[in-house]
């Protein structure tokens, strides 16, 4: 069959267009995917088989729900990892101090929670440093853990993070608790994904406003800990889970 040259050109252009769309789609997915590793290594859990769960809470400190959550964790003798928004840590250093005094790990979640995929490098650096200063002002020395807001990153983001001496932390299970209709909804979302060695993302606050209602998250956390402790799981902090990687 004779194919005219202009048809060949059209086919080639179509192929390039499809490939371009696929590449952009893949890059977009990887920029937000919690377990994606294209833009740099980030810890998001252990291999299957480890009966450990690391509970992590973003967007605090928040009154009264962070304090209520601390009571639940203390009741079960569980320690967790909290990624704090710097402006809230500066607003309520007393709650940040309560987190630290109860033996939990505190990490950096930027100062105002911007989407880092659309921020210039200078603003990314400033957000991280301002958050670090706010947390240090509240509790003093704290961990070098960092979680990007919404998990968003792009090429170069993790380079800046590591230049500042921070370790990027993502997750592989979430309770979708930012707009959950009930505690049962959160519990079901988490339970469907738990496989052992998981980093669970929950929220004790909200980037949108201080004082957000996270009572459902507090209730779900209570139930999840009871459920998985009964099944023989250990609840650990992110640093404790990461040490397991160096041992295994």
Specify the residue positions occupied by each region the protein language model found.
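Short, well-ordered coil/turn segments that N-cap beta-strands
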Residues: 50-53, 76-80, 102-104, 140-144, ...
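Active-site beta->alpha N-cap acidic-glycine motif
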Residues: 31-117, 123, 127-130, 134, ...
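N-terminal pre-catalytic segment of deacetylase/amide-hydrolase enzymes
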Residues: 1-55, 62-77, 91-94, 222-226, ...
